[in-house]
């Protein structure tokens, strides 16, 4: 069952140099088998991006109205208390993505888009996740994903089929 995004979830933007338009969407769903899926689609009417590498990292959890970093991200000096606008949220996503790549943090799930531009990643529990894609070029386009933060909350898990 496809479920709503929380207020922190936002669409993953995939840009193609030739198309100069946003490609992509992201859907969060939960199944009866306690699996939380993050489905990423990288295509529009004219362009499909296959073999795009994606990873998700659990970076934090909600603590009352704010988020706190957890796990391997807990010691990073990042202010998680002010997500009042998209630019601040994007700055945090960019910073966490840089830390994850620089420090070699192991993602919760990884995958590559198939011939239809689709990939299904798995999350292990409720929390704040970083969705990160790897840049690459093929013969027709340059793929440069923007890291995003999504919250998988208890309501998404509770509403599973």
Where are each of the predicted segments found?
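Solvent-exposed loop/turn and edge beta-strand elements of beta-rich ligand-binding domains
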Residues: 2-161
